[in-house]
Amino acid sequence: MLTRLSHILNNTLTKDIHVGFRKMANVADHYNDPVSIAVIGGTGLQSLPHFTHVATLKPSTPWGTPSSPISILHHPSPSTGKPIPIAFISRHGLHHELAPHEVPARANIAALRHLGVRTIIAFSAVGSLQEEIKPRDFVVPDQIIDRTKGIRPFTFFEGGMVGHVGFADPFDNKIGKLVRQCGHSLEGEGVRLHDKGTIICMEGPQFSTRAESNMYRSWGGSVINMSALPEAKLAKEAEIAYQMICMSTDYDCWHDSGDVTVEMVMGNMKANAENARRFVGAVLDELSKEEHNEVVLAKHLEGEMKFAGGLTAVPGRSAEAKEKLGWLFPGYFE
């Protein structure tokens, strides 16, 4: 059930986030240097030690404004000690004002790419569809089944320019490998990790019926949430390496352990919050190492959309579509 309650929990944690990290005396409203790494979620990351809030940005994009201001945090590189900028965005807004289908995912992803972001770590609380994935376990998924209903805008390529991008592997294998290594390094210290799994991304905001929950289990679903899509698809279109980290807070309604309550979910989330912070903090430490620069900059994805998004012949490309995509991909479609 928490899958669908995850946005409630994320909001609760977001309140803690914005009072937990170290703020500079004067936080800037601009940031001129490229930011390669971003976190999407509401997980308390800014309360991690050694993160300093240096800027709060309020960008606009051709697809609207993001779901929250973007916080820029400085994090010392484990390799050099130099500050590494990390962008943080709250998926459901600072005050949890956005339902899952209202999240402006295109604006979120576009704003992050425009900043220079090429790697996204997304965090999501989820419900478990399998007995072996217990509450408080972490899952680094490798697949998604789309059970959204087309309500959410899900592509940058429309209105006069068509683009097709492969989505066989919805999460980035290179970033995923590093995330799994970090998770396994914390096992035995409160972290229990499942290093693959299939997310069912449902539309919401209502919860599943028992029949639906059992159907998802029969399909091989591992966990369920409302957040993975269209976020992962848009990141793929934007040539951004994307990996979600899931934290199980309950069994979905298929389980005979009884109805899930908000109190139960909140209890598990609170009890595991420190493990979540340590996990994501370890991932950011690893990604900040100079040896991973090529992976973090997603050089293996660079230029993919120049071909995949160039399907529409030049005479057929609308001025509006060219302008929007030119903002996202400068120089690609001139």
Annotated model-derived regions:
Residues D252-G303:
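His/Asp/Glu-rich mid-to-C-terminal helical/loop segments that flank catalytic regions of hydrolases
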Residues I109, S213, L229-A232:
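Generic hydrophobic/aromatic pocket-lining and core-packing "Φ" positions
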Residues R113-G116, R217, K236:
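Non-catalytic positions within long, well-ordered alpha-helices that form the structural scaffold/packing
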Residues G160-A168, G221, D256-N268:
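Glycine-rich tight-turn/loop motif centered on a GG-T
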Residues F123-S213, S218-W219:
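Mid-sequence, gly/pro-rich, charge-dense loop/helix-turn segments that line enzyme active sites
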Residues G303-E334:
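Acidic, Ser/Thr-rich low-complexity intrinsically disordered segments
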Residues M226-E263:
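Zn-dependent metallopeptidase/amidohydrolase metal-coordination segment
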Residues L2-L5, L9, L13, G20-A168, ...:
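Metabolite-binding pocket within alpha/beta catalytic cores that recognizes anionic/polar moieties
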